[in-house]
From Swiss-Prot:
GO terms for biological process: 'de novo' UMP biosynthetic process; purine nucleobase catabolic process. It comes from the Archaea. Its EC number is 3.5.2.3. Zn(2+) 1 binds at H51, H53, K133, D256. This is Dihydroorotase. Pathway: Pyrimidine metabolism; UMP biosynthesis via de novo pathway; (S)-dihydroorotate from bicarbonate: step 3/3. It comes from Sulfolobus acidocaldarius (strain ATCC 33909 / DSM 639 / JCM 8929 / NBRC 15157 / NCIMB 11770).
């Protein structure tokens, strides 16, 4: 298949033709295209979200693989990586295989999964996973030592101390809860959903890769259960500093998409589960900043596609021959954010004014989203080398 249009290619915006099946075969100036995009549209590498809670399995009342990945392509995301804290918890070879089968049947994006920490690390390491997720409570477990010492795969850390769940939320506001946790880990480590600039500086100085979420930049405080999240939304000054400085030093943007049912989010604040569903917000938000002139296109593509692909070591994130044929097409258009395909219908970003609109998404060379509809394509496990042929 050939497509033609303006694209971000080799660090510039150029009018090009791209030939592909599941991977990009050829790029040249002229062709007889099967699909042509307008002058208002821009072809970009599809976004890669390395921190998503898909739910599914026994938590399908919150979200399913189909609804989460449909919401992802609506938001311009071509690869998601799923966290293990569903029910049942994913940290055995058998459960990993079951989880991968669930994705194989229902995912509209390319995908990967993390395992939880486990003493079965040698067997799990043989499976096509993205790596391991380390939660605060894991820092006290013997299984975590096994993972840190025996696996060379990526480890992704939720940077808070183990005892944070036992104290008042307001006391977690101090950034030392994050920095103290970072000092307990080593190796091929990624520090996720950082909420303040000091934590980011420390993580980078230790050679770790990093991400921040869009909601930790734009949401104005924890006003109710809809905006309750872990780690918590910080004060205005902390968020402003993270935006003004952190956005230019962090490696990537991740959504930490964490859906819950409407009934759960209507519980008393002390009882309702933390989590914001934002897998479809990150990409239009970052490209809106680009259209406003606040960040460059190079920086935007790096945050959403290039750097997460590098961190995960997967062949995405660039429009380049041999890379996966995963594209996000956007145009400049003002609109108000809302979820569309997720089971979650309320987020603290609802009504947020955006200037970038996703018009098309192609995953594995197939049209996954056309601006209105999501199509039942099947993504592949991007960490399984046999799926890349």
């Amino acid at each position: 298949m050939w497509i033609k249009g303006k694209a971000y290619y080799e660090g510039e915006i150029k009018e090009i033709c791209i030939n592909f099946d599941r991977s990009i075969k050829e790029i040249r100036a002229n062709c007889k295209p099967d699909m042509t995009f307008t002058n208002e549209e821009l072809i970009l590498p599809a976004s890669v979200d390395l921190h998503v809670h898909v739910r599914g399995a026994q938590l399908s009342y919150k979200e399913t693989v189909a609804t989460a990945t449909s919401e992802a392509v609506y938001g311009g995301v071509g690869v998601i990586v799923d966290m293990p804290n569903t029910v049942p918890y994913i940290n055995t070879p058998e459960r990993i295989k079951e989880r991968l089968r669930e994705f194989q049947l229902y995912s509209r994006t390319d995908y990967g999964i993390y395992s939880g920490v486990s003493k079965e690390v040698e067997e799990i390491d043989k499976l096509p996973i993205a790596g391991y997720k380390i939660y605060p409570e894991d820092l006290e477990k013997e299984e975590t030592r096994y993972v840190l010492e025996k696996s060379k795969k990526l480890k992704i850390l939720h940077p808070e101390m183990p005892f944070v769940s036992k104290i008042e939320r307001s006391l977690r506001r101090s950034y030392w809860m994050e920095t103290a946790a970072i000092n307990l880990v080593k190796g091929n480590m990624h520090i996720t959903h950082i909420t303040n600039f000091e934590t980011l500086q420390l993580a980078k100085s230790m050679g770790f890769t990093t991400d921040i979420t869009a909601h930790h930049l734009v949401v104005d405080g924890e006003r109710d259960c809809i905006s309750k999240v872990n780690p918590p939304i910080r004060d205005y000054v902390t968020r402003l500093k993270l935006f003004l400085k952190g956005l230019f030093e962090v490696d990537c943007i991740a959504s930490d998409h964490a859906p819950h049912s409407k009934e759960e989010k209507r519980m008393n604040f002390d009882l309702c589960p933390p989590g914001i569903a934002g897998v479809s917000f990150s990409t239009p938000y970052i490209y809106s900043l680009m259209f406003k002139g606040l960040i460059s296109i190079d920086r935007a593509v790096s945050l959403l596609s290039g750097n997460p692909s590098r961190i995960l070591n997967i062949p995405t994130g660039k429009i380049k021959e041999g890379y996966r044929a995963n594209f996000t097409v956007i145009k400049r258009e003002n609109w108000r954010y809302t979820t569309k395909f997720s089971k979650v219908t309320e987020t603290p970003m609802d009504g947020f004014s955006l200037d970038a609109k996703v018009t098309n998404v192609i995953v594995e060379g197939k049209l996954a989203f056309d601006g209105e509809n999501v199509y039942p394509i099947r993504g592949v496990n991007i960490f399984d080398s046999s799926s890349r042929s």
